[in-house]
């Protein structure tokens, strides 16, 4: 039998709180999603003023980053690369997302624990705020 490490509700709350505070400090609104190692949603927050369509997008970004173990922007870069001729249908799941803003959360050994995603802002800003949530979790992991 094997044991799989994954994010939990406390981790998700830590990330959501950090992103919410950062967004508030800049007067911004977005949707924050945190997924476990399997890509299943642990927590979702839509701040007042964030687009409703960003709920699905943030959830899909979190699923993609968690299940693939890479930033969603990196997947998007592969999709746009003529050299790779990469297609999103490769993933076999309509939740696969190549827009920036989904980041995997890793333990100190590099194993994926889940993901944090933000949607509702331009791609690079989504990713910047997701990185704040990711750092809030990774900074609390045991050595």
Placement of each model-derived feature along the sequence:
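Flexible, solvent-exposed loop/hinge segments and secondary-structure transition points
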Residues: 1-143
């Amino acid at each position: 039998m094997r044991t799989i490490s994954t994010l939990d509700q406390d981790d998700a709350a830590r990330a959501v709180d950090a992103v919410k505070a950062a967004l508030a400090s800049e007067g911004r609104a977005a949707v924050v999603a945190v997924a476990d190692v399997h890509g299943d949603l642990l927590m979702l927050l839509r701040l007042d003023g964030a687009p409703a369509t960003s709920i699905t997008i943030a959830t899909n970004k979190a699923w993609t980053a968690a299940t693939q173990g890479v930033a969603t922007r990196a997947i998007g870069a592969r999709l746009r690369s003529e050299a790779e001729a990469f297609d999103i249908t490769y993933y076999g799941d309509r939740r696969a997302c190549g827009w920036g803003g989904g980041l995997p959360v890793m333990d100190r050994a590099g194993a994926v624990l889940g993901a944090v995603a933000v949607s509702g802002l331009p791609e690079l800003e989504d990713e910047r705020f997701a990185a704040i949530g990711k750092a809030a979790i990774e900074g609390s992991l045991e050595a």
